[in-house]
Amino acid sequence: MQTYTTQMDAARKGIVTPQMETVAKKEYRTVEEIRQLVAEGKVAIPANKHHTCLDPEGIGSMLRTKINVNLGVSRDCKDYNIEMQKVMSAVNMGAEAIMDLSSHGNTQPFRQKLTHECPVMIGTVPVSYTHLTLPTT
């Protein structure tokens, strides 16, 4: 039974997660080094439980720099499938993170597709999403 809610929570309880083990291998560090860095808040391992195909990465002190790609649906490009092709191209070329900057239309289906099909870290910019949900006057 899982007794933690976040990677930091686990690390502070002395628990090594499968995500920490993966990050340790990728970063050529011991699992205990990674656990300690996460516990101290020097490393983050984004690992949302809804991101079912995630291949975890660590971000922070003493780790490799990661490649991030910005994309998303917009007024000019509304086709989710085209954006997903861009996502997979970016991943195949070595991107380790995708920042979803979607700014037009119903963006939730695109984000759900990302979390089910994209194996790298995913981030969003809440301010970009906020203007889509505010009532118009």
Which functions belong to the PLM regions below?
Residues 85-98:
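Catalytic domains of carbohydrate-active enzymes, especially glycoside hydrolases
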Residues 61-67, 108-127:
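Alpha-helix-loop-beta-strand connector modules within alpha/beta enzyme cores
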Residues 130-136:
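Conserved small/polar residues in nucleotide/adenosyl-binding loops
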Residues 66-82, 132:
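Active-site mouth loops of central-metabolism enzymes
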Residues 34, 38-39, 44-56, 71, ...:
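Glycine-rich, proline-tolerant flexible connector loops at the mouths of alpha/beta enzymes
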Residues 1-4:
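Basic/polar N-terminal segments that are highly enriched at the extreme N-terminus
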Residues 7-57:
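An N-cap/entry alpha-helix motif that binds or orients negatively charged groups
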Residues 50-51, 73, 120, 126-128:
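Short glycine-enriched loops at secondary-structure junctions
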